[in-house]
Amino acid sequence: MPKFYCDYCDTYLTHDSPSVRKTHCSGRKHKENVKDYYQKWMEEQAQSLIDKTTAAFQQGKIPPAPFSAPPPAGAMIPPPPSLPGPPRPGMMPAPHMGGPPMMPMMGPPPPGMMPVGPAPGMRPPMGGHMPMMPGPPMMRPPARPMMVPTRPGMTRPDR
């Protein structure tokens, strides 16, 4: 009867039967050996990729990163639009920088930017459900009625 060899454990099992293989493969030592094998394999793959990238860079096949070197003396790189910074020419300063306060948006929103939920100060229609809007479904309505504030600090169930 042929014996079963486990490459991960570097050992032969007593005989090649499904029950013996199943018992062996569910064992703690075998699972550790499998984990170690694939851990080493991933490390080898990563090192190989690093070596190939380094060789390609040294041969000039990969250009250096655009911002890897410091900018020359006197050069100023503007911050990305998402980062705060001094206002650039032609831009309106942010309200916290001493400029005029921003007016709230008036009128309908631009196409494709429909507000979600009722308009400020409006309550949903009787029954508590919002009318269906075109587009993908958002969230299902809450299981219990919404609490709508009547006065600051006071709430009552919506009817």
Curated annotation (Swiss-Prot):
Origin superkingdom: Eukaryota
Tissues expressed in: Widely expressed. In the testis, expressed in somatic and germinal testicular cells but not in elongated spermatids.
Record-listed Phosphoserine modification sites: 17
Keyword terms of this UniProt record: Acetylation, Metal-binding, Nucleus, Phosphoprotein, Ribonucleoprotein, RNA-binding, Zinc, Zinc-finger
GO terms for MF: mRNA binding; pre-mRNA 5'-splice site binding; protein homodimerization activity; single-stranded RNA binding; U1 snRNA binding; zinc ion binding
Pfam families (UniProt xref): zf-U1 (PF06220)
GO biological process: mRNA 5'-splice site recognition; spliceosomal snRNP assembly
Localization, UniProt: Nucleus
Region span, Disordered: 62-96
PTM annotation (Phosphotyrosine): residues: 8
Residue list for modification N6-acetyllysine: 52
PROSITE patterns: ZF_MATRIN
Gene3D superfamilies in the record: Classic Zinc Finger
First-listed, main subcellular location of the protein, grouped into a coarse class: nucleus
Positions with biased composition (Pro residues): 63-92
SUPFAM superfamilies with a match to the protein in the record: beta-beta-alpha zinc fingers (SSF57667)
Function in brief: Component of the spliceosomal U1 snRNP, which is essential for recognition of the pre-mRNA 5' splice-site and the subsequent assembly of the spliceosome. SNRPC/U1-C is directly involved in initial 5' splice-site recognition for both constitutive and regulated alternative splicing. The interaction with the 5' splice-site seems to precede base-pairing between the pre-mRNA and the U1 snRNA. Stimulates commitment or early (E) complex formation by stabilizing the base pairing of the 5' end of the U1 snRNA and the 5' splice-site region.
Family from the record: Belongs to the U1 small nuclear ribonucleoprotein C family.
Protein name: U1 small nuclear ribonucleoprotein C
Species assigned in the record: Mus musculus (Mouse)
